Amino acid sequence: MAKALMLQGTGSDVGKTLIVAGLCRAYMRRGLRVRPFKPQNMSNNAAVTLDGGEIGRAQALQAQACGVPPSVHMNPVLLKPQSGTGSQIILQGRLSGQAEARTYQAMKKHWLAIVLESFQHLKDEADLVLVEGAGSASEINLRANDIANMGFARAADVPVIVIGDIDRGGVIAQIAGTKLVITPQDAEMVVGFLVNRFRGDPDLFKEGMRQIEHFSGWRGLGLIPHCPAARDLPAEDAMALGRHLNGERSAHTKFKIVVPVLPGIANFDDLDPLRMERGVELIMIRPGTYLPVEADLVLLIGSKTTIADLVAFREAGWDVDLAAYVRRGGKVFGLCGGYQMLGENLRDPLGLEGPPSEVRGLGLLALETVFTQEKTLVAVEGVSLPDEVPFTGFEMHVGHTSGDDCARPFLRLTDGRQDGAVSKDGRIAGCYVHGLFGMDTQRRAFLARFGVAAGDFSYLEKVEAALDAVADHLAQHIDLDHLLTLAR
């Protein structure tokens, strides 16, 4: 029977995903059959499994760390935000429906059986299951019907380690405060804590660790310094985009790619391979910032709420900036939702993204998108055009796109379909397929279209090396043998 251990956080973006991924790799290298598990995830950054299901991208990365294909059971409940208060609901990889936050809070008690079923499925094929919580363990206002943190831990009898982030400050209060507000029954599930992202001399925080132990009654299991290798792994949360993507300009920078950040941004891990190119500078811009005229390429990436994001794009004034940029000879590429925005018209007759509506697109490609009930979720392969460079990737979208510019497709798939469109002058293009830039030959071919010589590195090898480095880093600062004794 497999053992399990759960890592919960004092908040979002404290490093849970990275630590679970690193532990997955560390224990896998010891010969254990390890599986990652996240009962409930809220993210628009998703991945497609081999059977055509959908899970959080972070769990796909953790599966890679374990050396196994991603499975829908690794993330049985995925909530994909569509508005400030509502989400699309994915259960065991399949679209189940949509609900407002108040509604799905009440629905969660019915999802516990699904969560426990998936958890058992993983336990049946593993020696160790490493479980990642969601958000904060101390959100006691959401404790009723909880399936993401302590609710799951108690239902499945899985011991918990609490992670605090010292980099954001107040880590003593983070962890001690968690103990203060949760119930004694929940607190009994906790077997210790980790302090993540420490910078400086660790001896200076020995007293801090003792104080956390004193106020919480939990044992300190490790002080983890900031891990530089984490930069080479995809960001899970949109809130981490700036930390991952906007760095200092390199002396090697030759090609500026500007990416507008919109509220419904999705599948932004498409950007990770590009940011590793020494000759590329990725510039993330947010509302209130103009679109730089010196951009070599404007890249519109995926969106979970294409119409709402198109409205936000216009409210930011970027439509005016983009039109002027194109008039001056600028180049634009759209991925998935960004591709849809480039067209002349977007129609949502069924009200899938809100009330039934029809909105004017950016008008840079002669095409129209109609949103339909059926969701396309499939792994694909083929070649880009006209260079005939092979690719593998996946489609994950709602809607069908057609129009005159589709006569000049960007991709040809092996199943006979064509995908994407290119303007007559070749300066505007887009497609639905995600994952293109993770293919080394395809990324090089894409950049070559703009006269940019790409590096000769392997993106997959960089990610693998980063996972190994994170595992080594954790092994230096955590007693992995002792941690294993805490699992049950």
Swiss-Prot record:
One MF annotation (Gene Ontology) recorded for this entry: ABC-type vitamin B12 transporter activity
Domain of life of the organism encoding this protein: Bacteria
Gene: cobQ
Keywords: Cobalamin biosynthesis, Glutamine amidotransferase
Protein name, as recorded: Cobyric acid synthase
One of the Pfam families matching this protein, by short name: CbiA
Keyword Repeat carried by entry: no
InterPro entries in alphabetical order: Class_I_gatase-like, CobQ/CobB/MinD/ParA_Nub-bd_dom, CobQ_GATase1, CobQ_N, CobQ_synth, GATase_3, P-loop_NTPase
Chain ranges of the GATase cobBQ-type domain: 254-442
Coiled-coil ranges per UniProt: none
Protein source organism: Beijerinckia indica subsp. indica (strain ATCC 9039 / DSM 1715 / NCIMB 8712)
Function of the protein: Catalyzes amidations at positions B, D, E, and G on adenosylcobyrinic A,C-diamide. NH(2) groups are provided by glutamine, and one molecule of ATP is hydrogenolyzed for each amidation.
